[in-house]
Design a protein with these regions (language model features):
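Short, surface-exposed amphipathic charged segments that create phosphate/polyanion-binding patches used
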Residues: 55-57, 77-81, 137, 256-259, ...
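Glycine-rich beta-alpha junction loops
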Residues: 44-47, 66-71, 126-132, 244-249, ...
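Glycine-rich, aromatic-lined ligand/substrate-binding cores of catalytic
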Residues: 108-263, 301
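Active-site/ligand-binding-proximal alpha/beta "capping" segment
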Residues: 41-67, 72-74
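Short alpha-helical segments and helix-capping/turn motifs at coil-helix boundaries
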Residues: 46-52, 107-111, 224-229, 272-276
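Catalytic or ion-translocation cores adjacent to nucleophile or general acid/base/metal-coordination motifs
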Residues: 1-34, 66-110, 143-155, 265-281, ...
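Short helix/loop capping segments that flank catalytic or ligand/cofactor-binding pockets
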Residues: 4-6, 49-52, 72-74, 132-134, ...
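Structural motif
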Residues: 37-41, 60-64, 120-123, 237-241, ...
Length: 308
């Protein structure tokens, strides 16, 4: 769906849109040769783009997938058809649609495995694509490792995670003030400084102005108190609301994402996020939410709705 790419162009998450996969690959390689960081959105099926990359003999440095493989009926689009054709098939014959999705996801993950074998650092983003591919006959799907055990868990073990705040005033200047505060308090953290400086230049706000940082629990507490002081002194024009991401330490029980490959075997133990929520409420938090959803339930519910 091209409008999704266009939105990311408007909000500065992408630099360019090229819908022909071969032309997009040529453009990306040209930018790489020039040493220019550049992001290109390609409006096509992921399998089509991966096949073009493989057939050209190109080995990506990094490879992952964020298609909606957690919902093979409503979210995932089989290859060889337009979005409109996919919608028509989904409504006319959902079982046939799921068969086409299963065929495509097997091809999809096989292409990823091929590129991994050639040297691309390949990881799963927790969207259930490995499970769907394995059920579609790709026995080695889990040779692709999850990004949490590979990269993120050491941060979680330190209590570090994504921490966000929103300017209820709607005034970007309030976020600019909190950015300066964060740089004053944590400016010795080189990656944090780089992120804040680049975010100010590159990332457009969507809705209320907001910012996100990866901070440790103690750092979050200190920063929250310091922002309270800004509000009390009138250095920002309205209160700031703080929240955290579902991707965080102690936030989600998800055996193929946040809690994949837990060292103590607790991948699918689901009660500790609830206990954490209760602790937050008892500690005086004013905004606590508990979300529920399983990958299989979502697909089954979507199918039931269509079959009514």
């Amino acid at each position: 769906e091209g409008w999704r790419i266009d939105k990311r162009l408007q909000t500065k998450y992408l630099d360019e849109r090229i819908d022909d996969p071969k032309a997009a690959l040529r453009a990306a390689l040209a930018k790489k040769a020039q040493g220019v960081p550049w992001s290109i959105g390609v409006c096509c099926n992921a399998t089509e783009l991966l096949a073009v990359v493989r057939d050209a003999g190109v080995v990506p440095d990094l490879l992952t997938d964020q298609t909606s493989a957690h919902d093979m009926l409503i979210g995932y689009v089989p290859d060889g058809m337009t979005v409109a054709a996919a919608k028509a098939l989904r409504e006319r014959d959902p079982k046939a649609y799921l068969r086409e999705s299963s065929r495509t996801v097997a091809k999809h993950v096989s292409l990823m495995l091929d590129l991994q074998e050639r040297g691309a650092v390949t990881f799963d983003y927790g969207n259930n694509i490995r499970t769907e591919a394995r059920e579609a006959g790709v026995a080695e799907a889990f040779r692709i490792k999850g990004f949490i055990p590979e990269y993120i868990r050491p941060l979680f073990c330190e209590g570090r995670g994504p921490f966000r705040w929103v300017a209820l005033s709607g005034d970007p200047r309030d976020i600019a003030r909190t950015d300066r505060l964060a740089l004053t308090m944590f400016g010795d953290n080189a990656s944090l400084r780089t992120w804040l400086e680049k975010a100010q230049q590159k990332i457009a706000f969507q809705g209320l102005p907001a910012r996100i940082l990866w901070l440790g629990y103690g750092e979050r507490a200190r920063f929250g108190l310091a922002v309270n002081e800004l509000v009390a002194k009138g250095e920002v024009s309205a209160p700031i609301v703080f929240g955290r991401d579902h991707l965080d330490c102690g936030s989600v029980a998800s055996p193929y994402r946040e809690t994949e490959a837990m060292a103590d075997g607790s991948d699918a133990i689901a009660d500790w996020p609830l206990l954490n929520a209760m602790l937050n409420v008892a500690s005086g938090a004013t905004w606590v939410s508990i979300h529920h959803g399983t990958l299989r339930l979502r697909q089954a519910e979507g199918l039931r709705q269509l079959l009514r």
